Amino acid sequence: NRSSDLASRFDEYVKSINSNQKDDSSNILTIQEKQGLKLFIGKANCTNCHNGPLLANNAFHNTGLLSSPGKLPDLGRKRGIDVVRQDPFNCLNAFSDNNKACMELLYASSTKELVGSFRTPSLRNLKLTAPYGHAGQQQSLTEVLNHYNEAPDAMIGHNEAKPLELWSWELWQLEAFLETLDAPPKIEGKWLSAP
């Protein structure tokens, strides 16, 4: 079972529900965390982009995230595709031994729709990945959730996100749920410290 390998409280909750042992699942998540889960898959519609085992669809989206102070807006995927296509060592060049495996780059669009778009990140172990945003513009989950709740206009391109319009207590519940996605590393402690 893949969920037991990930070992987050959310995964244990899902495992318990899937085993039809409701008594076992009742204390795994708090009431607030369960309400946050309901918001995540319901009203907040987070699963549009954050789905699957990693809670990321690996697609590119412009969510209107502002650039870091003093920085120009980042062109995101649009710029990335252009840079890779111009690289003499990309997978489509004469040095590649398998450019047939490079169909994604061959057919990748670099149109204006990709301006300001970035790959959807996984929501696993969020506490370990702060600060948030493609350039670390947001210091806390609270800032991230407030951004999506308001969904401001993008500085460049278009913001695909729609305002969540959640109440403050719903944002708190959603954040509580997101924290259940953290899991301790499945590795011996000796490998986590300097020799």
Predicted regions and their residues:
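Periplasmic c-type cytochrome electron-transfer domains
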Residues: 1-195
